[in-house]
Amino acid sequence: MQFSTFQTNLDNWQGASLIFGVLEEEIASQLENIKFVVDPKLLLKKVTQKKFKGEKGKTLSFEFLDQKLETLIIVGLGKSKDLNKSDIENSIGNLVRKTVDKNAKISILLPWELINSQLEITKLAESARLSAYKDNRFNKKKDEKKVLKEIEFLNLKQFENISFEETAQICEGVELARKLVAAPPNSLTPQEMSLQASKIAKDHGLEVKILEAKDCEDLEMGAYLAVAKGSDLDPKFIHLTLKSEGPIKEKIALVGKGLTFDSGGYNLKVGASQIEMMKYDMGGSAAVLGAAKALGAIKPKGLEIHFIVAACENMINGSAVHPGDVVKASNGKTIEINNTDAEGRLTLADALTYASNLNPDSIIDLATLTGAIVVALGNDVAGFWSNNDDLANDLKAASAQSGEKLWQMPLQKSYKEGLKSHIADMKNTGPRAGGSITAALFLEEFFDSEIKWAHIDIAGTCWTDKNKGINPSGATGFGVKTLVQWIKNK
């Protein structure tokens, strides 16, 4: 899909579908802005008959108004003094999603004089494209409806030199993350994930290293391998590196949980545990690889960025880890496994240790780690923890810019008491209360304390069961935009 603009005389414009935004003010004068496709007086009569006043979120749709236009959708933006860019993005996104099956090209005309910057225009374009996303890979009969190939913005006079190249690159990263999360577990195996990572490296000039089980044994990754050995599929430890040309001012590691399927192990997921949805337990790794794809195209300057994923399945066989086993992570700490369904933190323990040994300035990990964070924050907001105020504030800023909502949670040190073990250095789970916090405290044990670190729990935000905002039902690709924005802000 591409973005385009039409800046010349609108009388020469040709198109089939137009989305036109109006304010909750003098409608008649605003309708003059589309006289190039329809008689504004005739349209005003129809709008008046429908008692449409431009209220926020209200829409009117007209078919075949003129030979020059097949569909006109008028969307209310509310009062100019209350204009909110997020509301505009969601409104346009919803409309694009509703018309995506009907048109190869959708054109958009808004009161651009109320848009403050090129950034707001590109964010609108991003929302429109991500709202139009469809995944038909696994349908026997492919969707025969029209495929949206172009989103066009009309009359962007004050932004005539605008570029959507970076916007498209970010969208491609989000779309990759969505595809990875949505893929069934018999399709997206650890092997396939490593192939996807290798393709990113080849396409964008990143270094790639795939560690096999023997390599991980040599590095004494006992926690990661304890999870992986219950599956007949070999684990793949993925490490991509993006190095800017010229002097490196900062080194960063992005770590993603990569459970391509989680049965729960011997603490088997039963009842309402949604075992059938555990293909999305690699949502953190999808965000990291999506960010790698986007950043590989954007090529930020002065940075060395490491993308790390410990990919495997959590399954049951004769070799699977038992509840009560004690394993040793690659930093030498021993862990009593009191719950095999708290496996993500075990894989992350060795992934974080590996990242720490690279001596980065910052580490950010993303994981669908706990149900507790969903209970705490629901499905619209991800929780995050950090050991550094500057990093936390930078993430909050990136979150606000990207539109992906984060909420900082406490690293309550007294809760570490719940992780104490009588036979090992620690247990892998604490009591039910404060479960997302004790999970973060567990992870904090596996990297150098001098490194700035943040952990983002995306268990509630990586999937939506229904269309919501810019996200069609299914995988959201949550985390890609925030990671990319955080990097861009440096």
Swiss-Prot record:
Question: What EC number(s) has UniProt assigned to this enzyme?
Answer: 3.4.11.1, 3.4.11.10
Query: Which Pfam family, any one of them, does this sequence belong to?
Result: Peptidase_M17
Q: Which of UniProt's keywords are assigned here?
A: Aminopeptidase, Cytoplasm, Hydrolase, Manganese, Metal-binding, Protease
- Could you state one GO cellular component term attached to this entry? cytoplasm
Q: Which PROSITE patterns match?
A: CYTOSOL_AP
Recorded hits in SUPFAM superfamilies, A to Z, give:
Macro domain-like, Zn-dependent exopeptidases
Q: Name the chemical reaction catalysed here.
A: Release of an N-terminal amino acid, Xaa-|-Yaa-, in which Xaa is preferably Leu, but may be other amino acids including Pro although not Arg or Lys, and Yaa may be Pro. Amino acid amides and methyl esters are also readily hydrolyzed, but rates on arylamides are exceedingly low; Release of an N-terminal amino acid, preferentially leucine, but not glutamic or aspartic acids
Q: Please give the cofactor(s) recorded in the UniProt entry for this protein.
A: Mn(2+)
**Co-factor binding details:** Binds 2 manganese ions per subunit.
User: Which EC class, in a word?
Assistant: hydrolase
Q: Which GO terms describe its biological process?
A: proteolysis
Predominant location category: cytoplasm
Q: Where in the cell is it found?
A: Cytoplasm
So what does this one do? Presumably involved in the processing and regular turnover of intracellular proteins. Catalyzes the removal of unsubstituted N-terminal amino acids from various peptides.
- Family under the similarity heading: Belongs to the peptidase M17 family.
In Swiss-Prot or TrEMBL terms, this protein is called Probable cytosol aminopeptidase
Annotated source species: Prochlorococcus marinus (strain AS9601)
